[in-house]
């Protein structure tokens, strides 16, 4: 009988060793909470920076790695000062002359490497866009548009508009110079009666892979219509005929008037 009573006690001790109870054992060994770590990221700002040729720029590379990291900026541009803080590094880039430069920030955190990219564009808006008044040469008009101090010329499109409608445009992509340049566009046109007092304008547009820079000239107008020799001869004949008709009609009325008076 005693052995029968001891068996449950032994089983209880085996289930809860060290004299603990079910409630005490749960309090001593709570379940471990699940922890989800944030994904490792790297950012480079601004992602697109525009500067004048020969200018400088600052790019900021930031990350969320809590550990000491190794970071570097990879670019063909000349680097200047470096300023860093907790989770970020700022890099200075000097003498930017290429119209389009790619920059990469590479960060390694706990053996994992990530990178972010940015682009620096060097450009110069035209200092001026000037359309000269039309010049009559022979029986056609010559238009000249001057675009001054612009870069890069290879991404420039110059167009002429009459009354808001494009009558001519030219892309200068064949030019590959790396300096500021002046551009002159010459266009010869005929004009009709409908072109009189229509505003003529010249427009310069830089297309820089997503960045569009526009400039335009003040309007000029056609105030005199150029006529060909045939047109002049026809007009002279028409005028002479009209004058003759008017003189004949006038003579008839004069004779009738004199007859009535007598």
Swiss-Prot record:
One of its GO terms (biological process) is cell-cell adhesion. GO terms for molecular function: integrin binding. The chain crosses the membrane at residues 232-252. Keywords: Cell adhesion, Cell membrane, Disulfide bond, Glycoprotein, Immunoglobulin domain, Membrane, Repeat, Secreted, Signal, Transmembrane, Transmembrane helix. Disulfide bonds join 61-105, 61-109, 65-109, 145-202. Residues 23-231 are extracellular. One of its GO terms (cellular component) is cytoplasm. Residues 1-22 form the signal peptide. Residues 54-116, 138-209 form the Ig-like C2-type domain. The keyword Zinc-finger does not apply. It comes from the Eukaryota. Residues 253-262 are cytoplasmic. Glycans are attached at residues 60, 84, 182. Belongs to the immunoglobulin superfamily. ICAM family. Adhesion molecule that binds to leukocyte adhesion LFA-1 protein LFA-1 (integrin alpha-L/beta-2). ICAM4 is also a ligand for alpha-4/beta-1 and alpha-V integrins. Isoform 2 may modulate binding of membrane-associated ICAM4. This is Intercellular adhesion molecule 4. It comes from Mus musculus (Mouse). The gene is Icam4.
